[in-house]
Design a protein with these regions (language model features):
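Cleavable N-terminal export/targeting peptides
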Residues: 1-40, 230-244
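Short glycine/proline- and aromatic-enriched beta-strand/turn motifs that initiate or cap beta-hairpins
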Residues: 27-74, 224-235
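Short loop/turn motifs that connect adjacent beta-strands in outer-membrane beta-barrel proteins
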Residues: 33-45, 78, 117-125, 179-185, ...
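Residues that define the transmembrane beta-barrel architecture of outer-membrane proteins
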Residues: 45, 63-67, 102-108, 124, ...
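Flexible, solvent-exposed coil segments and beta strand-coil junctions
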Residues: 45-51, 86-95, 147-155, 201-206
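Membrane-embedded beta-strands that build the outer-membrane beta-barrel scaffold
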Residues: 51, 69-71, 81-85, 112, ...
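Gram-negative (and chloroplast) outer-membrane scaffold detector with strong preference
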Residues: 79, 84-151, 227
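Outer-membrane beta-barrel transmembrane domain signature
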Residues: 127, 131-220, 224-234
Length: 244
């Protein structure tokens, strides 16, 4: 009789314990829903102006090059619309053919860079981007004398103010780093793809302002000194006090 009562009490205790554990198990299996964190970064985060050094070096050590400056807008530390303007120049002579080529003309590019860093507010940035570029230019082509292979004799050749234009795309990969205060340095590598062109009646132009030596595709690069106003600062978290 006593054993039956003990067994009855043990059964009730086990049943009560199982019933008490059931809600805990159900709660443990329910995933916790975390509140969605809103992006409180301001849309406009700053603007930067820059100048390319590579073109200046080309002008100093070769017969062609360019002066180039750019302006870049910072949107949410993620998107960077860019406009690039420059002046391309060439004054070259081929030693073998004695052909001289000369041009000076402006060019422009517009496009967008994306910040590829995991932490988009980092003071250093990794970019991927795209540019559309265009130039309309005139060039002079001359030679002191061209020998006729059939009849012999030499005739001068001069073509002045030959009109041409180029449309092309540039695929961009680059980095820039904060040096001090608003001063930054940036590097980019560019793959250029010609879309459409008109070289005038004399054939392919030797040099195209902004594009470089003519051809279907080419690689290029820039090294920029950048002055940036705004951006590159971690946004304050909600409830964080300002520094005194």
């Amino acid at each position: 009789m006593i054993q039956k009562r003990i067994s009855k009490y043990i059964s009730r205790f086990l049943a009560s314990s199982l019933l008490a554990l059931l809600p805990l198990g159900a709660y443990a299996q329910t995933p916790r829903l975390l509140p969605e964190v809103k992006d409180t970064t301001a849309l406009f985060r700053g603007v930067a102006v820059s100048a390319d050094v590579v073109g200046l070096i080309q002008m100093a050590v070769s017969s062609y090059g360019q002066y180039e400056a750019a302006m870049r807008v910072n949107l949410k530390d993620k998107y960077f619309p860019v406009i690039e303007l420059g002046l391309g120049k060439a004054n070259a002579e081929d030693a073998a053919t004695q052909l001289s080529y000369k041009t000076t003309a402006p060019y422009g590019r517009v496009g967008l860079d994306l910040n590829l860093m995991k932490n988009k507010h980092d003071i250093n940035r990794l970019y991927g981007g795209l540019r559309y570029a265009y130039t309309s230019y005139k060039f002079d082509l001359s030679s002191p004398g061209i020998t006729d292979p059939n009849w012999g004799g030499t005739a001068e050749f001069n073509a002045k103010d030959v009109e041409g234009n180029y449309h092309w795309l540039e695929f961009v990969a680059g980095v820039d780093a904060k040096i001090w205060g608003p001063i930054r340095l940036g590097w980019s590598v560019r793959y250029k793809r010609r879309l459409a062109h008109d070289d005038g009646f004399v054939g392919n132009a030797w040099y195209v302002p902004g594009y470089g030596k003519s051809g279907n595709t080419r690689l290029g690069g820039t090294f920029n000194v950048i002055f940036e106003l705004g951006g590159a600062k971690q946004p304050k978290k909600k409830g964080e006090k300002n520094d005194k």
